[in-house]
């Protein structure tokens, strides 16, 4: 399913070419203005698949404590919403030296509804949770964030702002690799939020600190676009 979704996204940018021929199959460097790497159609499909599969599964892995995943998802959606509005506005995109994409500002509306729905979900998902997201919700939300980032040419920015998702996924990869190669575990338990729990940190404290980390990197992501 994730690869099919990746193929659909790739086909869309291949035929629609919202950024024109010269930018369709490129990766944009968010740290440097006017810095991008052309990788071609085939490599772009592989890259899109990695982003889609990585994002959806990373968000899914993070969904292990009450309220842990939905707030970072909303924060990332907020940042992408700001970027989509700026990118779809000729004046602001020129001011920040971002590539203008016609009509992409409509994604701001979609992301806003996503944030609103997330707040409603958080009302009942905060500790002690009454409802749970499940794989259907977490995989979908991760895929949505990846799709929006791909349309905005901000895949690397997604990795920065969604640093909590990256850390959670890496903790699982490191744990599995270490156990298979060395016969030893790096963490008491993976994903890493369970490691902190086993170290004696209350669930609510783990959740709150992950929220704070996401907020810090969200601010960093916005500053990167302005100060680069």
Model-derived features: positions:
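Membrane-interface loop-to-helix entry segments
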Residues: 1-4, 66
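Alpha-helical transmembrane segments
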Residues: 7-30, 43, 47-48, 52-58, ...
């Amino acid at each position: 399913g994730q690869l099919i979704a990746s193929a659909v996204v790739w086909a869309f940018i291949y035929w629609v070419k919202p950024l024109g021929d010269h930018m369709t199959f490129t990766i944009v460097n968010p740290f440097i203005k006017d810095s991008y790497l052309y990788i071609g159609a085939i490599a772009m499909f592989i890259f899109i698949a990695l982003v889609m599969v990585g994002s959806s599964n990373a968000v899914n892995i993070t969904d292990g404590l009450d309220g842990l995943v939905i707030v970072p998802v909303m924060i990332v959606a907020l940042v992408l919403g700001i970027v989509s509005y700026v990118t779809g506005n000729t004046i602001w995109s020129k001011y920040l030296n971002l590539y203008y994409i016609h009509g992409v500002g409509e994604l701001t509306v979609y992301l806003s509804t996503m944030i609103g729905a997330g707040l409603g979900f958080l009302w009942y998902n905060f500790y002690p949770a009454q409802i749970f997201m499940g794989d259907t919700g977490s995989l979908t939300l991760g895929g949505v964030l990846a799709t929006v980032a791909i349309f905005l040419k901000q895949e690397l920015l997604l990795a920065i702002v969604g640093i909590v998702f990256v850390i959670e996924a890496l903790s699982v990869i490191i744990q599995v690799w270490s156990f298979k190669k060395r016969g030893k575990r790096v963490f008491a338990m993976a994903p890493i939020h369970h490691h902190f729990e086993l170290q004696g940190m209350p669930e609510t404290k783990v959740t709150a600190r992950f929220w704070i980390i996401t907020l810090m990197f969200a601010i960093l992501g916005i500053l990167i676009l302005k100060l680069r």
